[in-house]
C-alpha cells in the first residue's frame, strides 16, 4: 500500500528537512485516503425494494425526487428493485436490477397520475424472489398497503416516505369529510413501519402532532446540482422577462393544481410590487 511504501522511503533515505516534511504530509494524506477507501469498501451494500405509485417521467415532485434517490443509491452500490404501476411512457433515466409492474388506474381529477392495483400475490412473490434487506414504501396508496402486508408476511423491515399531505389535499376537492379518515389511515400506516423519512423539520413536527410515533428521519430531497447550477444563469432569458440584474424575479416551478395554491404566490407577488 502507498502509506507503507512511504514509510520505507523514510527509512532508506536521509532527505533534507523540507522534503521530509513534504513526504510526511503526503504519508498522512495517503493513510487517510487508504482508510477512506477501506471504510467505503466495508460499508454494507443493501438490496432495497422501493414501492411507489408514481415514477419518472411522470411530472410531479415525488417522481422526480425518487428518481434522484434511486440514482444515488445505485451509484453507492446498492441493488434496487422497483415495484410500481405500468406506465404509458417508459423511464429511460434509470434501470433497476428488478421490476415488478402492477395494473394501474387513473386517480380521479388527476388524469395524468395513477395508482397501483393491490395485486398481493404478484407483489409478495416479487419481494420473496428479490429477498431485500428493506422494503421502502414511498406512497401510501393501495400498492403501498399491499407491499406493507407482503413485507410483513416475509418478516422484512419496512421503511416509508411521507411526500404528500393527502389529508390537506382533500379540502381542495370538496372532500373535507375525508380529512379525518385519511389522517387516521396515514397515522396507522406509518406507525406500522420501522421509520418514516420526511422532507423537512416542519413535516416532522406535523406528523408528530397528529400521532405518528414511529421514528421520523429528516431526509432532504435529491437535486441534480450539475443540471441546476448558477452557471446556467441566462441574461438573455432575464431580458425576455424585462428583468435586469437587480430585478427581483419570483418563479414558480410545479404543477398547476388547486392544492399548490398558486393564487397565494400571485397575490404575494402583487403585494411585493406595491412595496
Language-model regions: role of each:
Residues 51, 199, 252-254:
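Short hydrophobic "strand-cap" motifs at the C-terminus of beta-strands
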Residues 157-159, 168-188:
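Nucleotide-sugar donor phosphate/pyrophosphate-binding loop at the beta->alpha transition
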Residues 108-137, 143-149, 153, 180, ...:
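An amphipathic, basic-hydrophobic alpha-helix
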Residues 84, 100-103, 183-233, 243:
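Donor nucleotide-sugar binding/catalytic pocket of nucleotide-sugar-dependent glycosyltransferases
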Residues 2-103:
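N-terminal subdomain of nucleotide-sugar transferases
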Residues 244-260, 266-270:
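Conserved donor-binding/catalytic core segment of Leloir-type glycosyltransferases
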Residues 37-46, 232-249:
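Nucleotide-sugar donor-binding and catalytic loop/hinge architecture
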